[in-house]
Amino acid sequence: MAGAWSSNCCRGSSTGCMCCNKGKRNDSLLLGKRLSEDSSRQQLLQKWESMWSSTSGDASEGDTEKERLEEAAVAEEKPLVFLCSGCRRPLGDSLSWVTNQEDTNCILLRSVSCNVSVDKEQKLSKREKENGCILETLYCAGCSLNLGYVYRCTPRDLDSKRDLFCLSVEAIESYILGSAEKQIVSEDKELFNLESRVEIEKSLKQMEDVLKALHMKLWEVESKLSFAGSKS
């Protein structure tokens, strides 16, 4: 009886039963999470693109030539380093930046570091608008994370992508070179801190005790010598 009632609980209800409402809430939460993830990836791509678009291409109508050159100089001065999100090994940098692919959440680089290994097994691309492209999968040499793929063969209309490395935004992180303000202090220029001060004061106290002991020994010797001289 209970099973029959639960299977028909949604029928004839004007406000909707609890199981239906719960299912709708779960679907809504899942959709919101996916939209949030897609939005964050999109923002990351736009950030990388905006930081380095000034180094290539023409300036927009509202920008002056001076502003464009200044932005390009800043970009070249502080390039982005792309790291593996799994083990943080450097994979490449923005000096080899070509463009991004917003539809696939990928960035295209001309070259990558030795930390990127290439699987020589070739596969046909199943992506839209990439019919005829032959790809080779990219892996991190440190943690074997799947990073993306490299275009080995392309049809004539996609020749611009040939031999370019396509890194997935989900598999990489970025670091602005020179952004760290903290400097490493060498051993010969170590900062004077409370711990070193305590050690120095302890050493000085030990030296003071040694000097006092030597002073007492010297005083005893002088006393004996003066006593022996008075007897003679």
From Swiss-Prot:
GO terms for cellular component: CENP-A recruiting complex; chromatin; chromosome, centromeric region; cytosol; nucleoplasm. The keyword Nucleus applies. InterPro entries: Mis18, Yippee/Mis18/Cereblon. The modification Phosphoserine is found at residues 36, 39-40, 232. PROSITE patterns: MIS18. One of its GO terms (biological process) is pericentric heterochromatin organization. It holds the Pfam family Yippee-Mis18. The keyword ATP-binding does not apply. It is found in: Nucleus; Chromosome; Chromosome, Centromere. Residues 79-177 form the Mis18 domain. It comes from the Eukaryota. Keywords: Cell cycle, Cell division, Centromere, Chromosome, Isopeptide bond, Metal-binding, Mitosis, Nucleus, Phosphoprotein, Ubl conjugation, Zinc. Zn(2+) binds at residues 84, 87, 140, 143. There is a cross-link at residue 161 (Glycyl lysine isopeptide (Lys-Gly) (interchain with G-Cter in SUMO2)). One of its GO terms (molecular function) is metal ion binding. Belongs to the mis18 family. Required for recruitment of CENPA to centromeres and normal chromosome segregation during mitosis. Homodimer, and heterodimer with OIP5/MIS18B. Identified in a complex containing MIS18A, OIP5/MIS18B, MIS18BP1, RBBP7 and RBBP4. PANTHER family: NEUROGENIC PROTEIN MASTERMIND (PTHR16431), PROTEIN MIS18-ALPHA (PTHR16431:SF2). This is Protein Mis18-alpha. It comes from Otolemur garnettii (Small-eared galago). The gene is MIS18A.
